[in-house]
Amino acid sequence: DMIPEGNPFILYPDGSQKEIVANTSQLQKLRAVRKYTLTLEQKDYCTQMENGEFHVANKEDFSDSLIVGMAKDVKESRFYSFKPKYKGSYRFFRYMAPANSYGNVAEIELYDKDGNKLKPKRVYGYRWTVRGHEQPKLYDGDPLTSFTLQATKRGWCGVELEEPTHISEIRYIPRNDGNYIAEGDKYQLYFWDKDDWHLLAEKIGNRDGVLW
């Protein structure tokens, strides 16, 4: 077993040290969106969503498509959401990967004006995907699966809805390692003091992470 020797400390290049001691009388606010640092691989997945396009259409080949939004400032492997501004109802929706991207999108969720999650009638699109990362993975409700292309050819994944619908909210998350703060999960914040861990707070994750 590991035996603690004391409080953690910072060791500086000149050999000096600074002990880190918890001060529970002076708390700061902190919004956490991940449980673990963002690796270079995860950062690359985020980058591959930048400028990806969201289209609606009434023709299944998207020859009449309308761009209703783009993925912007995707810098963290977590859910993002926006409310597209357009008029009318459409039967088809798709995500089109940007140039020089393999897609690497974990999940897309569509909501109507009443906040109901829309269930695709059919999922289809660009055929050349990595085995195990086909189009249906983008709408399977599992953020640990993903839609990944074999080549960077602006591939896309589309859905047919049950009926023409106005999409009022779009949520998406890049391919990830599951270390983001998940909505509905319980999180505990501990601090070290002398020779043991102490529970400081307990929160339920929401769409924006957790605020301590």
Whereabouts are the PLM-identified features?
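Short, conserved helix/loop micro-motifs enriched in His/Cys and acidic residues
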Residues: 71
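Aromatic, loop-rich ligand-recognition surfaces of beta-strand-rich domains
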Residues: 1-66, 74-212
